[in-house]
């Protein structure tokens, strides 16, 4: 089986923002109404805003709430069945687990799609998120979004999560 390279050491590789393209899932068709098995890797977070206050605990809490909400929204949509990934005692993440290993773990767990991403706070008011999903059957990227959101508040994070959940829910996957 060919190895697929998935791109996310985005946090620390800022040029991706310049190269980012907004791929659409236009070529995919949703066949039937069966829920698609989806594994979600915990997103990474990076803050290079240079703000003097240490906001790590606040950001980790907001990221945890974001991850909980996206899992809840996607499972609640009826389009996805969440598949748990096991990476030992720690949650699976792009920073701690090689991408090929994550793909294999997701396949072994029975997932059809693997969703992963990261959020980067680049200034006091601007954050961006790079979020991708791979179809593990076709080995194609079916969701690839780079989005910015203004503010570092609970509302800003909720709006960003709701947008991503809506975009993922609109995704169609061939059976």
Question: What residues fall within each predicted segment?
Answer:
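N-terminal secretory signal peptides that target proteins for export/translocation
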Residues: 1-8
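Boundary at the C-terminal end of the N-terminal hydrophobic targeting segment
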Residues: 22-25, 29-34
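Glycine- and acidic-residue-enriched helix-capping/strand-helix junction motifs
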Residues: 52-65
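Residue-level preference for nonpolar/small residues embedded in alpha-helices
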Residues: 66-67, 98
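Bacterial N-terminal signal peptides
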Residues: 11-25
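Short, solvent-exposed, polar/charged sequence segments at loop or secondary-structure edges
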Residues: 75-116
């Amino acid at each position: 089986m060919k190895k697929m390279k998935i791109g996310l050491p985005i946090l620390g590789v800022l040029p991706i923002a310049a190269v980012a393209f907004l791929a659409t899932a236009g070529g995919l068709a949703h066949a039937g109404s069966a829920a698609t098995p989806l594994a979600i890797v915990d997103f990474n977070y990076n803050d290079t805003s240079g703000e003097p206050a240490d906001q790590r605990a606040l950001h980790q809490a907001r990221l945890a709430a974001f991850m909980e909400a996206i899992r809840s929204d996607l499972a609640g949509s009826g389009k996805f069945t969440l598949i748990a990934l096991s990476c030992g005692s720690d949650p699976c993440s792009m920073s701690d687990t090689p991408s090929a290993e994550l793909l294999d773990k997701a396949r072994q767990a029975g997932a059809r799609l693997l969703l992963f991403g990261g959020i980067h706070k680049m200034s006091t008011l601007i954050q961006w998120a790079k979020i991708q999903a791979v179809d593990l059957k076709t080995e194609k990227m079916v969701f690839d979004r780079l989005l910015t959101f203004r503010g570092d508040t609970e509302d800003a994070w909720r709006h960003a999560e709701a947008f991503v959940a809506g975009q993922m829910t609109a995704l169609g996957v061939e059976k």
